[in-house]
Amino acid sequence: MQQLLNEILDEVRPLIGRGKVADYIPALAGVEPNQLGIAVYSRDGELFHAGDALRPFSIQSISKVFSLVQAIQHSGEDIWQRLGHEPSGQPFNSLVQLEFERGKPRNPFINAGALVICDINQSRFAAPAQSMRDFVRRLCGNPEVVSDSVVARSEYQHRSRNAAAAYLMKSFGNFHNDVEAVLLSYFHHCALRMSCVDLARAFCFLADKGFCKHSGEQVLNERQTKQVNAIMATSGLYDEAGNFAYRVGLPGKSGVGGGIIAVVPGRFTVCVWSPELNAAGNSLAGIAALEKLSERIGWSIF
């Protein structure tokens, strides 16, 4: 496995320079684009990694999975009264579909859906940002995971579209807490800094029927785990989920920080990071690396 990871990084490294680092979040625009890392973590606790897999980066929308899991833990099936679990087919920050469907987001991984999930968690936790940080620390076993306040502040200063979505949902009665407070929590979640190794470890419960072996925690039950993996498979890569299923064939979740987490149910989790994005906002070299890994090992679930 170690040799394979090294080979794959060598093969996809020439793609660096063909994508573009996210620049709509000013604090992310200065990230060094040449970085590339990958980590594989097995349900039995074996870890393999290569490249910049130990270097923390801004996880951005990957945090939406953690938020969803927290909401499921405390509110169960009730959350689906306020949002769906269908692919949207629209840009992740689109307002058109939200207006047409009367303030009920299609799924928890578009921005509007993630904001509803944060609104649910805001009602549950006295300090949502701290609760999320502590939850993630337990899952990955790294007490040093923190939220980058500079990135969070930068995102808050450029919050107009997310605020518009939140206020639109509030006008339809699907947003219960103070919008600005929820936005602050949401941006602190997105600004969490984790490495490929951290994320591969943190997501291992989704490869093991909801059980996190290194923390000893039953995070979700088996049915809930299948549901989260299913939503990742259909909606985890913005409006490129179909292409990812075609090329990689695994449940996954991406973020504009350049990270992608993928789950091989019953076996492994894989995290890859390369900051340069394609036109859909997903890591260009990251998808290529996951495609090669899935092909060579035969990991596709299809």
UniProtKB/Swiss-Prot annotation:
It is an enzyme of class 3 (hydrolase). GO terms for molecular function: glutaminase activity. Substrate binds at residues 61, 111, 155, 162, 186, 238, 256. It catalyses: L-glutamine + H2O = L-glutamate + NH4(+). Keywords: Hydrolase. The keyword Hydrolase applies. One of its GO terms (biological process) is glutamate biosynthetic process. SUPFAM superfamilies: beta-lactamase/transpeptidase-like (SSF56601). It comes from the Bacteria. Coiled coil: none annotated. Its EC number is 3.5.1.2. Belongs to the glutaminase family. Homotetramer. HAMAP family: Glutaminase (MF_00313). This is Glutaminase. It comes from Pseudomonas aeruginosa (strain LESB58). The lineage of its organism: Bacteria, Pseudomonadati, Pseudomonadota, Gammaproteobacteria, Pseudomonadales.
